[in-house]
Amino acid sequence: MIKILYKSNRQIAESCTLADLEELGFDDVLWIDLVEPTGDEKRTVEEFLDTTLQSRATAEEIESSSRYSETETTIFANTNFLIPGPDSYSTEAVSFIISEGILVTIRQVPLRTLTDLQRRILALSTTKLYPTGYHILVAIMEGRIDLDADMIEIMSKEIEQFSKRVSLGENVNEDFLLDINQLQENTMMVRENVVDKQRMISSILKSDKFP
């Protein structure tokens, strides 16, 4: 699936039609969001930007030290978004490409941060707050950091509850230990996820392509 946010008469409009991308000018497009992209969608975007998009397997295999790269015209960045489950968290690789002020995001599942931002941008409908793809990328990171902070707050409350249960002399049985172990794993995942984003943001801010 493809969603294109583009400038039209000083407002921001959207299109979910691949053919529209071929009709739009390079200066019109702000954000191309690809969710489980088809081969045709990827090829059309690659031709439009004159660059190569990473596959999901490539994005997932990239080591943390190599999650950022750039060419003369394009920035490539990869990070993981945490998806909370009933007990444990999972991660979803997201690729970001910025070329000449156009942001491309590539993912395989719906993500609340991106969906909410698209709704907000279209509701405001003005280009004043989001004149380029760089501004949209910053907004995505801000929204994601807020969600990560919410997860940390929830885990802090869970840790506090476990501490109270121990203080009250509750029997530390196998289920209790399993819950503690899962909480530790979740905490480590959130920490690694936050550090991963810090590295990505730091690299982008250091780039001479960032306005």
Q: Residue spans of the language-model regions?
A:
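Peripheral, non-transmembrane regulatory/ligand-interaction domains of membrane transport proteins
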Residues: M1-F210
